[in-house]
């Protein structure tokens, strides 16, 4: 299981621990990933995704999973999220 957010693509970054004496040692900055269940209003289903805490805040800010996926670009989404985005777009186009 990779340490990458399924919605934003946020992943592991590298950097240095810097001591008081300015000694530098390599370290990794891990994203704050959570297993969450998000509900799609258009599809009427629940989806379990591994997302970062920042992405979860963005989903709530944009008004839910459907709105977040439709507003986001496909290049930053995981394959599973891209499939969801296409299904939601198709369902909303049928309803309109």
Swiss-Prot record:
Q: Which GO terms describe its molecular function?
A: structural constituent of ribosome
- Alphabetized UniProt keyword annotations: Ribonucleoprotein, Ribosomal protein
- Top-rank taxon, per record: Bacteria
Q: In its UniProt record, which GO terms are filed under biological process?
A: translation
Regions annotated as coiled coil: none
Q: Name one GO cellular component term.
A: cytosolic large ribosomal subunit
Similarity section: Belongs to the bacterial ribosomal protein bL28 family.
**Which PANTHER family does UniProt cross-reference here?**
39S RIBOSOMAL PROTEIN L28, MITOCHONDRIAL, LARGE RIBOSOMAL SUBUNIT PROTEIN BL28M
This protein's name: Large ribosomal subunit protein bL28
